[in-house]
């Protein structure tokens, strides 16, 4: 962090974006594979304020869980898993991310807060 770049991509360690880490970012986008990139959810609030686009990790990394969940459901119902259905759902990830960013901009809430709310609504909690 602190190096000028287009995309900061945390891919190994979680909680790298704490108050100090966010302040040191010199990028336009944060998008990576590490789980729990934000040390605390409120650290995500500072990203849009600084003009940094944040892609919540569990959204952009959803392909694996989509595949596993469909395999599980197919087994539970004694049906073969259709790889085309998996691919179709994975192909929706960019659209979902766009929805998150649009709602974030519209509502003033951070992308992480918006993504969490959408996830809770989808799973019924």
Predicted regions: what they are:
Residues 1-3, 14-30:
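Rossmann-fold NAD(P) dinucleotide-binding segment
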């Amino acid at each position: 962090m602190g190096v000028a770049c287009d995309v900061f991509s945390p891919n190994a360690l979680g909680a790298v974006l704490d108050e100090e880490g966010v302040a040191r970012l010199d990028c336009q986008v944060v998008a990576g594979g590490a789980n729990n990139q934000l040390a605390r959810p409120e650290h995500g609030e500072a990203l849009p304020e600084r003009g940094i686009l944040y892609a919540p990790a569990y959204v952009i990394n959803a392909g694996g869980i989509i595949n596993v969940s469909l395999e599980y459901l197919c087994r539970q119902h004694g049906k073969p898993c259709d790889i085309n259905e998996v691919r179709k759902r994975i192909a929706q990830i960019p659209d979902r991310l766009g929805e998150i960013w649009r709602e974030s901009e519209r509502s003033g809430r951070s992308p992480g807060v918006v993504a969490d709310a959408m996830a809770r609504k989808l799973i019924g909690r």
